[in-house]
Amino acid sequence: RSFPLETRLSNPQIKKLIEGGLSAPQTVTPITDPLSEAELECLLSIPLARSRPSVAVYLSGPWLQPSQNQALMLVDTGAENTVLPQNWLVRDYPRIPAAVLGAGGVSRNRYNWLQGPLTLALKPEGPFITIPKILVDTFDKWQILGRDVLSRLQASISIPEEVRPPMVGVLDAPPSHIGLEHLPVPPEVPQFPLN
């Protein structure tokens, strides 16, 4: 007997124990045709440093300063939107005040929405994407490449693994020491029923 999916998700008796936890059956969509080598070369891979993951970005748009056609931006997968500093833009750009909820709470009067197209690319030859609106930092502190651009570029992020030598600890204490030697010796009194 089969149940509809809504019943299976709400009835705990029908859920199955999968890999140590209760979970509903998962639907997996099979890949019918694998990507060709030409399509794999078109996918964008961003190599990043572990300490400060930043990437060069090529910008164009009607509201940018003429000197700001290339910039180094911080890649932040936790940021929903891309953020540009205000000094990269002309003074009379179309702005809408925005309240941004971050780790430190809601920040008001600091960010504006730039309503206007902005074209971005990670290579001079493309692929180019156009973003309809972008956050502007009025304190000129942040230039962040957010998830909106990364998802439109269909970029994958590769962070190199740090190779560490294996740590080998040398035990120089005699086997009778267990690390409690600094405590006082317990009293020798009969403790019923422990002895």
Swiss-Prot record:
> Which Pfam families does the record match to this protein?
RVP (PF00077)
**Which UniProt keywords are given for this protein, alphabetically ordered?**
Aspartyl protease, Hydrolase, Protease
Catalytic center residues: 76
Q: InterPro entries from the xrefs?
A: Peptidase_A2_cat, Peptidase_aspartic_dom_sf, Retropepsins
Question: Which PROSITE patterns does the UniProt record give?
Answer: ASP_PROT_RETROV (PS50175), ASP_PROTEASE (PS00141)
Q: Could you say which EC number(s) this protein's record lists? A: 3.4.23.-
Q: What is this protein called?
A: Protease
- UniProt entry tagged with the keyword Amino-acid biosynthesis: no
One example of the protein's molecular function in GO is: aspartic-type endopeptidase activity
Residue limits of the Peptidase A2 domain? 71-149
Biological processes annotated in GO: proteolysis
